[in-house]
């Protein structure tokens, strides 16, 4: 997968727009959000996308994101926080409550490094965002070699990141996949970041300018995934 659209269930998107996203050339979708996420909205969005053969990932930020029928679950593990709630605390609580029923083969953990200090998710998770390039590379190595996480996700959350940081962090990984998200608003930015990232995630621009969002995916339309 080279390109994923990230959809917020708390935001409305017409069915016609969803159809355009499905046929844009993207490789799949992430359903996830930080604020005002209701299970009914998650269910509706998942069902609207249900007819596509593209993979649909549910990113579990809280219990309202859990749909038992979903094919793929993403579990964020925030690496650059000192609040253990976001590294393993909430995870342990959920496993304690539902562990016997969790479809582990459909669950993938993703090591997050959040780098936009003004983002809601940074405030929520108490992320330490004033990191050097060396700090971020070290987190990449931590994700792969200590925690053995399958995904290392650098999240600039609405702000376009530094391609050089992405290049350095990606180069530090051998087996863990590098995902990049944040501020991609043009096909040129998509092409720039995908030179280094295994997968780019495009989100906010969907709700700001759909046509520009579609352009970020069309460059992948003829490529083999």
From Swiss-Prot:
Residues annotated to bind Mg(2+): 8, 34
UniProt cross-references to Gene3D superfamilies, sorted A to Z: FMN-linked oxidoreductases
Residues that, per the record, bind sn-glycerol 1-phosphate: 6, 153-158, 183, 203-204
InterPro entries membership: GGGP/HepGP_synthase_I, GGGP/HepGP_synthase_sf, GGGP_HepGP_synthase
SUPFAM superfamilies the record matches: FMN-linked oxidoreductases (SSF51395)
Catalytic activity of the protein: sn-glycerol 1-phosphate + all-trans-heptaprenyl diphosphate = 3-heptaprenyl-sn-glycero-1-phosphate + diphosphate
Ribonucleoprotein in keyword set: no
Pathway(s) per entry: Membrane lipid metabolism; glycerophospholipid metabolism
Cofactors (names): Mg(2+)
Keywords of this entry: Lipid biosynthesis, Lipid metabolism, Magnesium, Metal-binding, Phospholipid biosynthesis, Phospholipid metabolism, Transferase
Example of a GO MF term: magnesium ion binding
Entry EC no(s): 2.5.1.n9
Pfam families hit by this protein: PcrB
Domain of life: Bacteria
One biological process term in Gene Ontology: glycerophospholipid biosynthetic process
Role this protein plays: Prenyltransferase that catalyzes in vivo the transfer of the heptaprenyl moiety of heptaprenyl pyrophosphate (HepPP; 35 carbon atoms) to the C3 hydroxyl of sn-glycerol-1-phosphate (G1P), producing heptaprenylglyceryl phosphate (HepGP). This reaction is an ether-bond-formation step in the biosynthesis of archaea-type G1P-based membrane lipids found in Bacillales.
HAMAP family from the UniProt entry: GGGP_HepGP_synthase
Protein name (database record): Heptaprenylglyceryl phosphate synthase
């Amino acid at each position: 997968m080279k390109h994923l659209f990230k959809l917020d269930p708390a935001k409305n998107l017409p069915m016609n727009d969803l159809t355009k996203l499905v046929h844009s050339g993207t490789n799949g979708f992430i359903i996830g959000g930080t604020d005002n996420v209701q299970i009914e909205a998650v269910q509706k969005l998942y069902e609207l996308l249900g007819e596509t053969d593209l993979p649909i990932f549910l990113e579990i930020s809280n219990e309202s994101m859990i749909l038992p029928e979903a094919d793929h679950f993403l579990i964020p593990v925030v690496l650059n926080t000192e609040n253990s709630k976001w590294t393993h605390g909430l995870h342990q609580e959920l496993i304690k409550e539902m562990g016997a029923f969790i479809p582990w083969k459909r669950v993938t953990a993703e090591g997050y490094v959040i780098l936009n200090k003004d983002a809601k998710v940074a405030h929520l998770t108490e992320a330490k965002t004033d990191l050097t390039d060396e700090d971020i590379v070290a987190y990449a190595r931590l994700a792969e070699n200590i925690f053995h996480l399958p995904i290392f996700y650098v999240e600039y959350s609405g702000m376009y990141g530094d391609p050089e940081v992405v290049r350095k962090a990606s180069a530090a990984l051998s087996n863990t996949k590098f995902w990049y998200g944040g501020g991609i608003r043009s096909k040129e930015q998509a092409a720039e970041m995908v030179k280094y990232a295994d997968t780019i995630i495009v989100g906010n621009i969907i709700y700001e300018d759909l046509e520009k969002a579609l352009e970020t995916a069309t460059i992948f339309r003829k490529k083999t995934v």
